[in-house]
Amino acid sequence: MIDHVGISLPSLAEGTRFFGRTFELLGFSGEPYEGGGFVEWEDFAIGEASVDRQLTRHLHIGFYAPSREAVDAWWRDSTASGYESDGAPGPRPEYGPEYYGAFVLDEAGNSIEAVNNGPRRQPGVIDHLWLRTRSLEDATRFYEAVCPAVSHTVERHDGRTQIRGSGATFSIVEGPPTEGLHLAFEAPDLATVVAFHDAGVGAGFVSNGEPGERPIYHPGYYAAFLLDPDGNNIEAVFHDR
């Protein structure tokens, strides 16, 4: 399961307004967590881009909508607020017989979607992601190396690779590469965190933080980090609460 996804935007204030309104319209209750320069809604977090925090670009995120009416309301509200449409509400049968989605571009040009497509995939707000990469073969090799450790499967298709677990899915295609993305897999124990990191480093990929506790996030936050071939920060995390 995906534990969380983090992106960086030009303005934290505007991102908080836009995504806060998004999740209100999509029926998610509860206040976001704010701290450490981030705002987080369940499994999705935003921060402000800076010299030390790369702007997130060329990413697609689909958020779960409880109904087609919620998709419509979100798109109308977002476009009325000045966000550019990236696709009006409607069926998308190429993705599935019940698939109904709408799309806008966020302030960094990322494609944001509200989608109604059956039951929610996992607790949280994220339904799926699409990443772009310079080399589909290199990106696929990375995920083939690390995903078995975190109980995700990697499926090669014509022109794309899909990663599946027990919750949200993500797919990878070639194109202008996704940048500034942080994606964390949930780990059931510390041994899984270590296995994830060892698998990536053993396959020749770059460590971005060895396994260990990160109490800055919370006591018992055990994590390890790798860079994917496009430089995105990929994590496995065990919450020992």
What feature does the model see in each segment?
Residues 2-11, 53-125, 127-135, 202-241, ...:
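Vicinal oxygen chelate
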Residues 6-45, 130-169:
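Core segments of cupin and vicinal oxygen chelate
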Residues 15-19, 78, 109, 139-143, ...:
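Conserved active-site tyrosine of GNAT-family acetyltransferases
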Residues 38-43, 104-107, 162-167, 175, ...:
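Active-site beta-strand termini and strand-to-loop segments that position acidic
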Residues 40-45, 55, 97-99, 164-170, ...:
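A short, glycine/Asx- and small/polar-enriched loop/turn
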Residues 53-54, 110, 168-172, 232:
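Short, charged/polar, Gly/Pro-enriched secondary-structure boundary elements
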Residues 130, 137-140, 149-214:
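Structured core of small recognition/catalytic domains
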